[in-house]
Amino acid sequence: MKRILFVFLGLLAAGVLNAQQTHVDKIFVDTRASFHQDWRPGQYNSHFQGDFLNLHILGQISDKLTFRVRQRLNKKIDDQNPFNATDFLWLKYQFHPKWSVTAGKQAILVGTYEVDSAPIDVYYYGTFVNNWYQYYAFGVNVTYTPAPGQNIVLQFCPSPISPAKQNAYSYNLYWNGHIGPYWKTTWSYNYVEDETTRMMNWIALGNRFFMGPLALDVDFINRASFSQKQFFFSDWSLIGKAILTLGKWNLCTKVGYERNDAANVDESGHSYDLILPAGNDYLYYGAGVEFFPLGGDHLRLHAVWFRDNHDRINNFDLGITWRFNIYSRSAAKPWF
């Protein structure tokens, strides 16, 4: 599979790039590796690990048709799901300046910045995100752009909380935009089907505030079934993240708390929410530092500590992330 990808890459560079309308804009690789350590009283473990090796291809087929591919080269390809290692494989048709349709494999659109961030830029997640079956899926989006930087999206795709081969779906309404210059948003309402064919409602509100060198993320997710007694604030997640930028350095911290009341069960005693079962809570937190030696995002060093209230294991990662440009159609355009 990887050999086929590189042959395809060579063909693109040799032939397709010469077409007037059909061309590749960018081809690049990004990767992250780390030295992971964890310890609890009386026990210490450590190992080197490769976290990500991603190949990105972006381009257009015509002036109204654009595409994107992101392939994880270090992820095992499942015979039952041959696109398991493919995050993005989509085609976008911009049929009107304010309207577009996107079809193919893409991110399942759920609000909050913890979900919205590229996985290579996230060092640890909470239970809500960790327990999804899939984060990317084949589906269809219709996007309306009423103004620059404001996108309203309707998405129909497989459900993130059911196996990929199961006929369970998610119906998503998503807004990515801003309220003034200092408040960015990634909000969604998601009507999702779980592996038992029951439906759940997610209201996910991601907010990013800019205060000089400080960026503050505040994410809130409310999860509920129409059948449960208390719809709001009984099954929820609250996540806060802060990044203080000082020259080439980022000082970072993230804290999340997730809770599902014990009363959120059906007549048989089964939890409505299978991601965070009724009667459970989860607290996770950590802090770290990032250093960008060359000043841009193409080289990053990080040191991150994190733990939670369940395993009570201290985790500490030392790592490096780098991006390498293979091809850029316009030298004037940044490739990352």
Regions picked out by a protein language model, each given a short descriptive name:
Residues 170:
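Conserved adenosyl
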Residues 14, 149, 327:
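Phosphate/oxyanion-binding loops and surfaces in catalytic or ligand/nucleic-acid-binding neighborhoods
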Residues 4-13:
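Sec-dependent N-terminal signal peptides
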Residues 15-19:
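Sec/Tat signal peptide C-region and signal peptidase I cleavage site
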Residues 21-36, 44-159, 167, 176-179, ...:
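Outer membrane beta-barrel
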Residues 23-24, 34-44, 62, 79, ...:
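Outer-membrane beta-barrel pore domains
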Residues 164:
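Surface loop/turn signatures of beta-propeller and other carbohydrate-active proteins
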